[in-house]
């Protein structure tokens, strides 16, 4: 890529133009924008104004620590200049500007992470107005423009011009036009059918709708005509100079002629008699009007603000095309003063938990002056979906990021913001329909909060909602669960897994369901982390039904029966443990099974099968942790099941019976699968099952006409020992 820059003493006659190709994804995006019909093209202006606002934020932030940065232009503003003759709508800001490298990288050669994501969203039917959320808002100019010119001046570089008609390439050259001082001028050359965006009324309408809460003055420059009375001589002179004057006016748009209309009227009254000598002529002038005079919404009294105003502010703040779901507007006074306006969006952003993403979306102001928009210390990461503004009276204006990390004031603000967010969620929870929408989008954040925020864990746990064995298609809170607990029930029972159906049909919940004990279904991977920290709720312990030592409410008679069963099957447990050796830590009689013959449970402090699955899926997992945290497996057998009873009888008749060993291994492997674990050697297990199928179909292993492949399978299997006359179904290795 050519990167030749001209030295300042080089003659400027031969202007050097460099051509660059757009990065493939950006070229694709532009082609999509240009060749697809979108009805709401007006959002291009919102995006360009929003970019100007960001550029102004940057220079203002830099000037807090180095005031000389503003020597190239003290005023921070945005100007909109429509030109009907040239069909251009120029957006000028006095922001930070771009260096040549910025221009090449930001506008064409380096794709943002959102470029591809936005194209995918568009093709899936998303609204074009989402473009700003993906960081590629500039390209929306091509919704209305056939060509876009960008002229920019950064304090550290010369003035450059970028230009593209979107044909897969763009040009960059040193700009020899009118010096800018500092900032950026974006000039969309509008298509013939898009001239409505040059109309004063239309521009005002768009700015009011999308950008009225931008923190810098947006001024519209419009060329207008007015009548002026002059004497005949003056009129002739005026006509002679008309062309010259038009030229001058175009050049000096920021220096408008100010006409004292009042004095005209007085003159008219005084010189009524001289009217015959006067002549009316049309005079052109540039009218300037500030379009966003509204004072910051967060400084107003919440009682005076309508929901529509909050909605408009939210949209201008976030570039979201939908309304917010909930809002919290409050001020804190006393030793510390600040105001905050917080919004919950309707949807989680596409990159909510991406590491590269900025950690929050709260803009920090100090006494109405914008300081920064991703101050990590302002709100914890689990609340990174909250959008809004915080305006402090106490922080110094020239505060740096380093100082913010140490700031006690900020710690107090953060604590208050978290408290108010939780209040907002609790209020939202009273409206079931809206809370359902909120929970679908942000349940992971609540659970992450339980994992990370020990101080607010209790409050956050009240916001959790889960499906249970008794709740049907509705999610319920832990509080609801507690109100339905049986009289003699001491614990809250839960099971973790992949899907609702999987956990509902699990062997682990059989006895609990039979006894009418409600079980909570935790089916998101983050639930495993959440429940590690959430040990109890309202004094009741949370107990996993997949771990050892499950205590169920029992009367004395049931306890006595259970003890008898333990004694009766003690010998079988010992034989099974000897057969399985190190595969399991112990074999015990179960109190949780009803219809399944056996299941694998894990030790109290180890991982569950579900957690082991999650950890195995981590690309950067630590294998040493896997070693000691991986589930210590316990095999539990169901003493009331016919398979286990028959196995006990066979084992007692002959403990060296080979078929007992085969069946124990098959039972263990099947229990592993049904309990949510994966097999270390699935092929051997599959071969055992195929052998069983053949026996069930009456296929003779010794038959020479048997299929070659089955012979191959048989060769791999160790020969069965024991009496050939025993049932062939039992001879399974």
Swiss-Prot record:
Alphabetized UniProt keyword annotations: Acetylation, ATP-binding, Cell membrane, Chaperone, Cytoplasm, Membrane, Nucleotide-binding, Nucleus, Phosphoprotein, S-nitrosylation, Stress response, Ubl conjugation
Organism of provenance: Pan troglodytes
Modified residues (N6-acetyllysine): 58, 84, 444, 459, 490, 586
Short name of any one Pfam family annotated for the protein: HSP90
Segments of skewed composition (Acidic residues): 230-246, 256-269
Name under which the protein is recorded: Heat shock protein HSP 90-alpha
Function field: Molecular chaperone that promotes the maturation, structural maintenance and proper regulation of specific target proteins involved for instance in cell cycle control and signal transduction. Undergoes a functional cycle that is linked to its ATPase activity which is essential for its chaperone activity. This cycle probably induces conformational changes in the client proteins, thereby causing their activation. Interacts dynamically with various co-chaperones that modulate its substrate recognition, ATPase cycle and chaperone function.
NCBIfam families: PRK05218.1
